[in-house]
Amino acid sequence: MTLPQIAIGFGAAILIPYMNVFFKYQFNITDSLLGLLFSISSLLIGIGSILAPRLSVVLGGKIRAVVVTQMISLVFLLLMGFALFLWLSSVGYLLRTALMNMSAPLYSAFCMERTPEQHHGLVNSVLSLAWNIGWAVGPFVSGVVQQRYGFKPLFVATAILYAVASILTWAFFRHTEGMPELPQPTLFQSPEYPE
């Protein structure tokens, strides 16, 4: 469960915190337009989070939905980084953000379904640690790359890391779709495990 989170965390850490710098550097965007872009992005994240459970039903499972949304988001990530026009890069940013963030609640829910209740806190902590490993190193790496080469290598590296995370998620968990969730004990009884 943690390897995909490490890859996504590092991929995000080298690029996502610097979107304001990227848009300023690449397109000389005004602060008010940048603020509007980020506001719309937050709104789309909320809408995507609401739609994600329905998407997992349509696609036949949480893992399928996680992998599909992450892989499609790669197209828009690269569009954002390599577009020649602000409007096209902005569309890429908005769609990448919505799609990539749709997968997070689904992956978290999947992990909790596969974990006995008494271990939920530990699993959440480990997933958070895995995500933050990338954020501990990523900003330094990003700063060095930005100074020497600009943003384009960071977009490529992030796309590769996100793709690796999606492939790992699919490889590790595709066979668990459709399996029953772990039974959870109720207040007065122990769980009954199938034999």
Where in the sequence are the language-model features?
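Multi-pass alpha-helical transporter architecture, strongest
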Residues: 158-190
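A membrane-interface helix-boundary motif in multi-pass transporters
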Residues: 144-162
